[in-house]
Structures are given as C-alpha cells and as structure tokens.
Amino acid sequence: MRWLAPAPRNGNRARRAPSLAGDLTALTATQAALEIANGNISAQEYTAACLERIAAAEGDVRAFVHIDPEHALRQARALDERRRDGQPPRPLHGIPVGIKDIFDTADYKTECGSPLFKDRQPSRDSTAVARLRAAGAVIIGKTVTTECAYFHPGPTRNPHDLTRTPGGSSSGSAAAVGAGMIPLAIGSQTNGSMIRPASYCGVYGFKPTHGTISRHGALVLSLALDHVGVFARSLADCALMLDVLAGYDAEDPDSRPSAAPEFRAAFATKASAPRLAFVRTPVWHKADPETRTAFEALAQRLGGAATTIDLPESFAAAWADQRVIMYTDMAHNFGAEVERGGDASSQQLRDLVAEGSQNTAMRYLAARDGARNYRAGLAELLTNYDAILTPAAPGIAPKGMATGNPAFNTLWTLTGLPAVTLPLLRG
C-alpha cells in the first residue's frame, strides 16, 4: 500500500471507529451530500472522518491497495474552496468514493491485483472515474481486486467476521462500504463479482443493464459480459451514483446512444405494488438449506405479490455457456501477458487461459447464441412481472479466503439484465 494502516488486531470483527468519525461515517452518501451542500459540514471534515474510520479498520479488513490521505484531503479542500467561491455543489460534492483497482486513475497506480501489471501508472482516468470527479467526488483510493478480477483472492477480509471471505472479485469495494470506511465504491462484474460480495458484506450492490455504465479505461475480461456497478448503503445512494455514471460513451462499443434513465427521480416516485416472480433457477439445489427455507418463507409472506416459477431445463446450459464466453474472451484479451509472465500468475489464472484457448469458434458462437436465447426467454417472463426475486448467493460468506460460488449471479450477467442485492437476511 502507499499508506501504512495500523497493524491488524486480534478478534473476528473490524474495530469500531472513534466517536467523531463514527458520527459522520454513519451518514449515507445522500445524507452527507445534503449536509455538505447546506454548509453543515465541509468536504474536508467528511473526508477526514472517513480517513479516520479507514485508519481504525483497515489493518483488519485490508480493503485498500492504494490510499493517500493527504491527496484525498487536498481534493476535499479544493472542493470546499469552490463552494467558498460561490460555485454550486455538484451531485457527489465532497463524497469519498473507492475505486476497484481495475479502473484507470491518473493519480493512482492501476495494478489489477496482479504482478503482471505491477507499478502500472495510467496517464488518464477511466470514463467512470472521470464522471465521478466531474460530479465532485473525492477519489479516496483504490480498493483490492482479486487477481485480474478473477477467482484468486487478495488479502481483504469480511468486515462482519474476519474469518470469512468478503467475496470477489470486487472484494475491497464491498468490504470498505460494509465496514463503514466509505459510503460509496465502484466495482465490476463478469460473473458474480458485485452481487455476491455485496451480499456477503451486507451492503446494497447494483449491477445495471449491460452497457449502462462505460467500461472505457477498465481492465477488459469479456466485452460480452463485463458490467460496471456500485456499492452503497442505501437504494437512494445507488440511484445517486447511477445518475452520475450512466450515459453514452463512444469509447465503449456496448454503450447505447440514448438518454439514460433518471434514477433518483424514479426512486422518489411512489410505485404501485410490484408483481414479483420468485425464480428458482436450474442451480437452485446449490443454495444452502437455510437459504432455500428463508426464500420460500419470504415468498409465502408476500402472498399474491409473488409467484413461484421454476425455470425450465432449457436454461440449464447457461452456466456452461457463460464459462465458455468468459474463458475464451479472457484468454484472448490477456492470455499473452499471462504466458509471458510465467509463474507470476496464479495457477487458477493460467488454467483459465489454457482452457479458454482450447474453445473453438463454433462453441463460442453457440454460447453467444445461447445467451441471446436466455435473454429472450427472461424478457418474455418479465412481460408478466416487474422484478425477479432470487438469492444473491448460496448462503452466508464461507470461512477462509475462497471468494464463494457465483452460481446465483451467472444467469443475470450472461443475459445482461440489471440486478440489485438487498441486504434483507442475515446469517
């Protein structure tokens, strides 16, 4: 790290913040932005409170790979100076945001959790980071990612139980928000890298529709599958971030040249009772018994608002198709770097590249056709329902450092559908 945090301390929970930091860091981003806009607190005060919380918890949680407190405070002071000069506050004015270390940042290295990219210093921000800065965010630091946003874990631990995984690959972003270090962070998902960590760390995670947020300047695993999303402490905060990040970018081939939805306005609109489909996918048997029982009980409590639907066997090949697409694309996009790096990469990543390199064009194209068919099938289902209710993970975060099973995220990533983790149940 660029900043040495306090040494780890014994115990299974991250230590609590000092009282001042605890008071301010308990605010959601929406609340903090309002307090800053009204002049009740300054951007510097709020950033300092977050840094104090980071100093208290980082030795245990290990969510950050690069952080520079003085640089963060300089950003905050510059934002306060703008306000003193009479300039209006921007949507994220003075709000610290953590950046998964696969997104280019002109002021921090971007190493993608891999020795292959050690000391890599981008010359410009990724589109997502540039939009955050333009909205007044304080880019507080880079959060830990698993190696090349794949399975091999980094050092991050679950803030609610240090013996358990935070999930991955967006490990640091989910853990930092879950630990109360920062109110917001960005991550990415190519299989289950946002929805699962959000579930394990007890925060809101929102992966919007494929192409909603630009991936320009982020590590490319698979253009067909890569999504950018957000971690937050409330749905209102997710909407705030989406209003900043969503929108067309000509440098992302999957970005759509159409007006982005107004997420905060939609969130504030009183909605009628939704029609929910409680969906059991072909991997339903992989859920822990406690998860199955809890969701079935939830569906019963919802009564007529939720209809139980078992997806047909025509969806069963989706998990194999996702694997073919992801592995083939990753082998194409950085297989050469992995081969040149030799033992610098984990065996997991080398095995992925080897498998992906063996897939034929015919098998790859069949998997892409499958993805379109699954999406069409789900679109037909959603003509009768407003949303799908289904687990974000098989169960609670596993012990140890393995990042957990993404099986309950795969289908929604493969089909590009939006997904949000709601921290409703606790193990």
Question: For the regions a protein language model found, what residue spans apply to each?
Answer:
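An N-terminal boundary/leader segment
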Residues: 1-73
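A short helix-breaking turn/cap at a secondary-structure junction
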Residues: 9-11, 16, 207-293
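Glycine-rich, small-residue loops and helix-cap segments
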Residues: 39, 94, 100, 134, ...
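Acyltransferase
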Residues: 40-48, 77, 262, 289-311, ...
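Acidic/His- and Gly-rich active-site-bordering loop/insert found
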Residues: 72-74, 82-153
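Short helix-loop capping/hinge segments that flank enzyme active sites or metal/cofactor-binding pockets
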Residues: 92-112, 265, 270-279, 324-379, ...
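Glycine/threonine-rich flexible loop motifs
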Residues: 110-119, 288-289, 397-403
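Short glycine/serine-rich loop segments
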Residues: 124-248, 413-426
